[in-house]
């Protein structure tokens, strides 16, 4: 799936809407543009992956929407985290962290994440930044998240991480299987 907008062709699972008013509204920060249209169309053939076989488009309707996005912010309190992680039926959280995957070092925060992971809630770490990636082993706080059962979202967009989780959960994968598959590219959504 691609997005063609304002003369640019971009991978849908690598693209984020950045502006609600301008024509140049979509950006693909962590993956090159596939083509640019002007007088001539300039294709970025190296980045265009062709399967080699023609197949009929098969939409996937089995999505489990018991997924939330939790954006961290300075001063976030335990009751907020506990309320979100305690949502009835919650199966996965996309945790938007600072920079390359950093989060509060507070004991209660790590404890809440550990308890949620132990209950089978999949927690995926993505950066709040427009570009770049999560590197959980780079800093102590990221390493603590790993110890709490949080998995890296690498350079995934928030939108792509949510969709991937909904797809995997909707197809009946267990929490451990989902955690494992979040570390693999299914459709070019992350760079490994």
Short names for language-model regions:
Residues 1-3, 176:
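Core catalytic loop region at the nicotinamide-binding pocket of NAD(P)H-dependent oxidoreductases
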Residues 97-192:
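C-terminal non-catalytic interaction/assembly regions of soluble proteins
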Residues 2, 11-100, 105, 185-192:
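Accessory alpha-helical/coil subdomains and C-terminal extensions
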Residues 8, 74, 130:
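Short, glycine/serine-rich, charged loops/turns that create anion-binding
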């Amino acid at each position: 799936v691609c997005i063609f907008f304002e003369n640019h062709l971009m991978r849908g699972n690598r693209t984020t809407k950045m502006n609600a008013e301008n024509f140049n509204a979509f950006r693909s920060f962590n993956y090159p543009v596939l083509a640019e249209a002007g007088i001539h169309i300039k294709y970025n053939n190296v980045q265009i992956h062709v399967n080699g076989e023609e197949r009929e488009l098969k939409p996937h309707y089995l999505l489990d929407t018991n997924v939330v996005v939790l954006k961290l912010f300075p001063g976030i309190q335990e009751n907020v985290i506990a309320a979100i992680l305690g949502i009835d039926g919650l199966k996965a959280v996309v945790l938007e962290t600072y920079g390359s995957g950093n989060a509060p070092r507070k004991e209660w925060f790590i404890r809440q994440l550990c308890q949620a992971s132990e209950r089978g809630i999949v927690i995926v770490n993505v950066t709040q930044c427009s570009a770049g990636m999560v590197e959980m082993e780079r800093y102590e706080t990221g390493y603590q998240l790993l110890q709490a059962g949080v998995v890296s979202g690498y350079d995934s967009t928030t939108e792509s991480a949510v969709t991937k989780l909904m797809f995997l959960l909707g197809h009946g994968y267990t929490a451990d299987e989902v955690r494992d598959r979040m570390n693999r590219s299914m459709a070019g959504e992350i760079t490994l």
